[in-house]
Amino acid sequence: MQLRPLGRSGLQVSPLAFGGNVFGWTVDETLSFRLLDAWVDAGFNFVDTADVYSRWAPGHAGGESEMIIGKWLRQSGKRNRVVLATKVGKPMGDGKFGLSPAYIREAVDASLRRLKTDHIDLYQSHDDDAATPMEDTLGTFAELIKAGKVRAIGASNFSAPRLVESLDVAERLGLPRYESLQPLYNLCDRAVFEDALEPLCLERGVGVINFYALAAGFLTGKYRSEADVSKSARGATTIKKYLNRRGLRILAALDEAAKRYDATPGQVAIAWQMARPAITAPIASATSIVQLDELMAATRLQLDADAIGSLDDASVETVRDAT
């Protein structure tokens, strides 16, 4: 498998990352282990999670995903075959959130315990924290890198101005810089990333590992009507917003390309992202071996210029699309 450099970190990652939000939430421990084994045994090495996964689920406190990954790492002996990414900053209860030095030091040790490892390959700021000076946050990350607890750092959900500020502060003070950005990006959600973040990442050599690569499943073609959406737990909020003129136009273009390439709409959606010059590795999740096989096969699909152009055109926003 052709690995890709993640920014200037020195890390080499597979062209697709497994999104660990499902572990301990919609996927139990046994199936999580099977999915992770299949992923790594197929040559993929990139796994992304966060300390907060899956705090939103009833009865969960956060850390469930990290604990399952950690147990798998210990039992499988495959730690040296994984580029392990996690995040810090989302609310974890009891006032624990943000990017203050004290909280980062506490949170990284908690993540290391749950992950049953002595280092995190990519430690990401899950959200921006305007209340903490950028130099304090980056300085703390520098301590963690020097201590061997973290290899590289990344940012998630940062605006272009704040990412620029962080890169400039790091350069000016000789501190570690964010080597990756984790933004929302897919065929349905293009404008925010492409307008300012994409050119910035290309110019500054920042890797991009975008989340919601399949728009919460919408780009698989599974949801084409209100009735379909009502069957999903996410339907009322996340997926329903995509079910409009533009969304249906995107699905039609995906269907056309899928037929041409003997692929699925979801595979085409992933392949379109992988063809973008700024994208290092989209993040996608699977809840079954069948879904995982489909995701992995998407990395072998190379769209030609005509297919990419058709998808580009179909996903352009117009004033009538919100209806």
Language model features with spans:
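Active-site beta-loop-alpha junctions enriched in small/polar residues
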Residues: 21-23, 52, 87-91, 125-128, ...
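N-terminal binding-site loop/beta-alpha segment at the start of enzyme catalytic domains
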Residues: 1-81, 146
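Beta/alpha (TIM)-barrel catalytic core signal, keyed to glycine-rich beta->alpha loops juxtaposed to Asp/Glu
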Residues: 132-318
